[in-house]
């Protein structure tokens, strides 16, 4: 039946004035340099090469172009089901995943802690096996990276990290797609991180050098990134000929930066530390004073939700802010992740420059 549906849709034409627009979602021509990601887990970007990450971004651009700009219908995930496990609340991760998976013809199933609590009423091993028998993939937004690792070990289907205490890889894919669209290429850009040494920063550290991007990090004392992740990032920088610097001075990190990036100072689960953290992060607000020492073509990113103490309105709502396209690209990148892990689809759009 699916083959018959594809045949009908491939041959169908929608009248557009005197022309016909063909809705075509075939897999396209085989690519000699095609990256094979089908069946993989996406737990952290440290497990992926630069070419593999670029492939996911290429696929993101392809889906965005074909669906948003050309108006094509691509039921690439028809007959597929996605389990969505959320221990932490979410707006963008949930909305982008649910709408994106459904737009591609799949069925997302959302589960909160009221429905499932990893490792509490049932062992993670048993949960992984049940999910594997009923869904084609799982996206999990959890407190502990170790839960994700065990889930992936015991499951026979792809597990995707929707956020953990250590990493947030799907956010970084959206960031990189946004920067590629704006600058035309990622190689040679300097990223300036000003804020907490958190999961977003960790994911940047595991991937930026693979694109030839430099990274300048400023965090308050006591809020530096995980030492083991810093060590790996230093090795990536050495292998790729890029620069990595860590400081406690926000202006030093912003100096010459093409992209100013910050995030929440108080992540979910850290509410009791609010007073202490607000005091520690004094002087870390991104303002036009910060931007003054950045590169002339500076832009700004924030994964949201945003608080005024992290970045002032002048920067956040300025024409230099890429926050809105960054948020939208969460949808196209998670769609690309699911398509790459669950299908043999090949992008038809010409490969962007990275």
From Swiss-Prot:
Carrying Phosphoserine, the residues are: 133
Q: Which Pfam families match?
A: OTCace (PF00185), OTCace_N (PF02729)
Provide a Gene Ontology MF annotation, just one. Answer: amino acid binding
Q: How is it modified after translation?
A: Acetylation at Lys-88 negatively regulates ornithine carbamoyltransferase activity in response to nutrient signals.
One GO biological-process annotation of the entry reads:
urea cycle
Which compartment or compartments is the protein found in? Answer: Mitochondrion matrix
Q: Which residues carry this modification: N6-acetyllysine?
A: 70, 88, 144, 221, 231, 238, 243, 292, 307
Catalyzed reaction equations = carbamoyl phosphate + L-ornithine = L-citrulline + phosphate + H(+)
Source superkingdom: Eukaryota
The residue span given for the transit peptide is: 1-32
Extract one GO cellular component term from the record: mitochondrial inner membrane
The transmembrane residues are: none
What keywords is this UniProt entry annotated with?
Acetylation, Amino-acid biosynthesis, Arginine biosynthesis, Mitochondrion, Phosphoprotein, Transferase, Transit peptide, Urea cycle
Q: How is its activity regulated?
A: Negatively regulated by lysine acetylation.
Task: Please give the InterPro entries that the UniProt record associates with this protein.
Answer: Asp/Orn_carbamoyltranf_P-bd, Asp/Orn_carbamoylTrfase, Asp/Orn_carbamoylTrfase_sf, Asp_carbamoyltransf_Asp/Orn-bd, Orn/put_carbamltrans
Quote the EC number. Answer: 2.1.3.3
Q: Active-site positions, per UniProt?
A: 263, 303
Family note = Belongs to the aspartate/ornithine carbamoyltransferase superfamily. OTCase family.
Subunit note:
Homotrimer.
NCBIfam families per the record?
orni_carb_tr, PRK00779.1
Q: What does this protein do?
A: Catalyzes the second step of the urea cycle, the condensation of carbamoyl phosphate with L-ornithine to form L-citrulline. The urea cycle ensures the detoxification of ammonia by converting it to urea for excretion.
Q: What is this protein called?
A: Ornithine transcarbamylase, mitochondrial
